[in-house]
Swiss-Prot record:
Cofactor(s) the record lists: Zn(2+)
Complexes and interactors: Interacts with GyrB.
Co-factor binding comment: Binds 1 zinc ion.
InterPro entries: DNA_gyrase_inhibitor_YacG, Znf_NHR/GATA
Full protein name: DNA gyrase inhibitor YacG
The protein's role, per its UniProt record: Inhibits all the catalytic activities of DNA gyrase by preventing its interaction with DNA. Acts by binding directly to the C-terminal domain of GyrB, which probably disrupts DNA binding by the gyrase.
Region (Disordered): 46-66
PANTHER family in the record: DNA GYRASE INHIBITOR YACG
Keyword Metal-binding: yes
HAMAP family: DNA_gyrase_inhibitor_YacG (MF_00649)
Source taxon at top rank: Bacteria
Alphabetized Gene3D superfamilies for the sequence: Erythroid Transcription Factor GATA-1, subunit A (3.30.50.10)
């Protein structure tokens, strides 16, 4: 394995982050940036693109038991 230091860019703020065990929030530079990203996913500001269109009524029922 190589001892080269790999740097990545924080997806939230753009700051350089060392990709190593000493950077616990990688690829984010901090817990703050990690939580900002999580909030964007929770608010559906970010999403994985899909061609499939699902409506609320597709395969969902209040009567479904597991």
């Amino acid at each position: 394995m190589s001892d080269d230091i790999v740097n990545v860019t924080c997806p939230t703020c753009g700051k350089a982050v060392e990709w190593s065990p000493t950077s616990p929030f990688r690829p984010f530079c901090s817990k703050r940036c990690q939580l900002i990203d999580l909030g964007e996913w929770a608010e559906e500001e970010k999403r994985i693109p899909s061609d499939v269109q699902i409506t609320d009524s597709d395969e969902w029922s209040d009567e479904t038991r597991y």
